[in-house]
Amino acid sequence: MSRNQQLFEQSQTLIPGGVNSPVRAFGSVGGTPVFFKRGLGARLWDEDGKEYIDYVGSWGPMILGHAQPDVIAAVQATAANSLSFGAPTALELEMAQLITQLVPSMEQVRLVSSGTEATMSAIRLARGFTSRSKILKFEGCYHGHADSLLVKAGSGALTFGQPSSAGVPPELAAHTLTLPYNDVQALEHLFEELGKEIACVILEPVAGNMNLVRPTPEFLGALRSLCTHSGTLLIFDEVMTGFRVALGGAQQLFGIKPDLTTLGKVIGGGLPVGAFGGRADVMAFLAPLGPVYQAGTLSGNPVAVAAGLATLKQLQRPGFHEELALKTRQLTDGLARAARDAGVTFSAQSVGGMFGLYFSAECPASFAEVMQSDKQAFNRFFHGMLEAGVYLAPSAFEAGFVSIAHSEADISQTIVSAQGVFSRINDQ
């Protein structure tokens, strides 16, 4: 029995499902989860000593790669002065200054400890500011595990939400409306019927939790126009896209200005952190200035903020995001070419340093189209690549991530490995 198998068996006796976040259990792809012990650059090593090229990147934060020297030095220097104060620090001011400089729509910002906290707090703020209860999200978009966001779409455009998790009261879920991603007609219909009752619309401006789905320009434009007309706040959940698809996030890339933005992942450099911010008149409703309460013992934790600052400073290097996007396109183009040569139905696309792999003829534009891809083929591909030393997201419904630490040799090795795996897929 491998060390990974031993650890997973032991973990299942003490930790529900053996993991502290469900996707890590390999439930979607089957098999034993990999237990990692070390990372450096674009590489990971598991408890059995096996080496992998990493395309998960801790689900997005590791944009510089693992154990980046400047980030490690910042963490060590800050930790030497204390791990936490529970009081204001100069570091959190520096972080707020940098975020508002890089993302101009965020006129003010509040630091929290996770992406879930950020989205949960932004929605509460939107409800407090507008004095409305309903919110709109899109099918297949994930915004953390707050109760009101664990809702899936019904069959009709105006169907009120039904809980997609036990423990979420139906009466709470009823305030959450859902629509298909990229469906402008359904969006216009909903706002015609209920626009004046909707506090906010929250969306991933590049969906990354139903694999990767790009927004259409018409969809984003309609969202901004309808929200402005109805007095509804537009929230961009940039926990995943923030500072990754462009220095100013997806809103810079697509030229759409939201009212509120949520951040996480990259701004912690690998440590737990989140943030939300936006229009100053909206942020003024937050306590201690306003009636909307939000607090946190570890909010603005100095060690996490130091790691985030060190990361963001690296991202400001001229050409950083162009280089990252090029590496990612080289990966997806190479994988698509390898699949085509092997006669495997496959498509791939990328946005900045994010990418999506689909066992379907075309890249999907909605959750329904994502669901039509061949998930069994993906599972075979995942395990073949894992055996070859390439670590991809263990689910057909998750985006992948490239770091600036990935070399041409890493990408070439990945494509060569994929050629062998693709050649075997149709035989299985």
UniProtKB/Swiss-Prot annotation:
Q: Which residues form a coiled coil?
A: none
Q: Which reaction(s) are listed as its catalytic activity?
A: (S)-4-amino-5-oxopentanoate = 5-aminolevulinate
Annotated EC:
5.4.3.8
- Keyword entries, A-Z: Cytoplasm, Isomerase, Porphyrin biosynthesis, Pyridoxal phosphate
**Primary subcellular site in the record, as a coarse category:** cytoplasm
Q: What class of enzyme is it?
A: isomerase
Which residue ranges run through the membrane? none
Its protein name is: Glutamate-1-semialdehyde 2,1-aminomutase
Family from the record: Belongs to the class-III pyridoxal-phosphate-dependent aminotransferase family. HemL subfamily.
Gene3D superfamilies to which the protein is assigned, alphabetical: Aspartate Aminotransferase, domain 1 (3.90.1150.10), Type I PLP-dependent aspartate aminotransferase-like (Major domain) (3.40.640.10)
Q: How does it assemble?
A: Homodimer.
Give the UniProt subcellular location, in the record's own words: Cytoplasm
Q: Which GO terms describe its cellular component?
A: cytoplasm
Q: Which residues carry this modification: N6-(pyridoxal phosphate)lysine?
A: 265
One GO MF term on file is: transaminase activity
Name of the gene this protein is made from: hemL
Task: Identify the metabolic or biological route this protein is part of.
Answer: Porphyrin-containing compound metabolism; protoporphyrin-IX biosynthesis; 5-aminolevulinate from L-glutamyl-tRNA(Glu): step 2/2
* Superkingdom as given in the UniProt entry: Bacteria
Which terms under GO biological process does the entry name?
protoporphyrinogen IX biosynthetic process
Name its co-factor(s): pyridoxal 5'-phosphate
- One matching Pfam family, short form? Aminotran_3
Q: Which HAMAP family match?
A: HemL_aminotrans_3 (MF_00375)
The family database entries (PROSITE patterns) matched by this protein are listed as: AA_TRANSFER_CLASS_3
